A protein has these predicted regions:
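TPR alpha-solenoid repeat register
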Residues: 63, 133, 182, 233-234, ...
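Compositionally biased, proline/threonine/alanine/serine-rich low-complexity intrinsically disordered stretches
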Residues: 10-22, 279-280
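Bacterial N-terminal signal peptides
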Residues: 1-12
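Short solvent-exposed coil/turn linkers within tandem alpha-helical repeat scaffolds
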Residues: 56-60, 127, 175-176, 228-229, ...
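A cross-kingdom marker for long, charged
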Residues: 240-280
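Short coil/linker segments at helix-helix boundaries
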Residues: 17-50, 59, 70-129, 136-178, ...
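Flexible, glycine-rich surface segments
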Residues: 218-228, 232-237, 241, 245-255
Length: 280
């Protein structure tokens, strides 16, 4: 995870088609429910759901990794980081005021990541190709990258975690290409770094970074279409990408679907209203 097409089948009224029905988050497990609550900005409820899953499945590192994600998302929301104009204007984002993170939230975030990493490392020591453990490690690295970049504004340090997440994602996808959530890590690296000026991209390639913007979009699209826990997040990133490319129709379709699926998250509806007002 790190921030940054038409998906009519995802945003059209009516039930999801069979190929996508399994991808959509349900409330059938505490883990699924927690992600739904997190995307709906119901953070306390999400923490309770993730805690329940962690108690039921202490050997699953996705539980504490998901809990860490809820701490990060709640902090981004509290600090007002999730504002479209900042993401669409690189200079404005870089020049934004220095943020004041909550120490207690940071401590809880770090503890959740430490639990996830400890459990994942134990699983991988016994089974090096365990998909859930690898996915949890990818999420852990992505969350650390997001915190460094979006809250602390330590972009170079963030890039190191992004690169490590991309390498692990490639490893997981080589083992099992059906882990569609993992495509997001590779897609983010390509897309975000692909936006840099050509000399910067050349330098980043020397250090092993992937900087193909179009390939990044393709990877994000795979998660947005077929992912599970990270599917809504990938759709959000694609909406941001569409707005950057002045493709308002595409952004509107993605946002409409997200607004229907997560009505408590006013971020989607607010930007959708702005787009509709701009057309009048």
């Amino acid at each position: 995870m790190a921030l940054l097409f038409l998906f009519p089948v995802l945003v059209a009224p009516g039930p999801a088609p069979p190929s996508l029905a399994r991808a959509i988050l349900s409330s059938s497990t505490p883990l699924d429910l927690g992600f739904r609550q997190m995307y709906n900005l119901q953070f306390e409820e999400a923490h309770r759901s993730f805690s329940e899953w962690e108690q039921l499945h202490p050997d699953d590192p996705l539980g504490p990794a998901s809990d860490a994600a809820a701490y990060l998302f709640s902090e981004l929301e509290r600090l007002g980081v999730l504002r479209w104009k900042l993401f669409l204007d690189d200079e404005k984002f870089k020049q934004a005021r220095r943020l004041a993170p909550d120490p207690a939230t940071r401590q809880a975030f770090d503890k959740a990541l430490a639990r996830s990493e400890q459990v994942a490392d134990g699983v991988l020591a016994r089974s090096p190709q365990d998909g859930n453990a690898l996915l949890a490690k990818i999420m852990d690295l992505g969350l650390r990258s997001d915190y460094l970049a979006l809250i602390e504004k330590r972009y170079l340090a963030s890039l190191g975690y992004t690169k490590r997440a991309g390498i692990l994602a490639e490893k997981l996808l080589a083992i099992d290409p059906s882990y569609y959530d993992a495509y997001l890590a590779v897609g983010i690296e390509n897309y975000i770094l692909g936006l840099k000026p050509a000399p910067v991209r050349w330098l980043l390639r020397i250090y092993g970074a992937q900087t193909d913007k179009d390939q990044g979009i393709d990877r994000l699209r795979l998660t947005a279409e077929k992912g599970h826990y990270l599917r809504p997040f990938a759709q959000l990133l694609l909406a941001v990408a569409a707005l950057r490319d002045k493709d308002q129709n595409q952004a509107r379709e993605l946002l409409a679907g997200l607004a229907r699926e997560f009505p408590n998250n006013t971020l989607y509806q607010r930007e959708l209203d702005r787009l509709q007002s701009a057309q009048k």
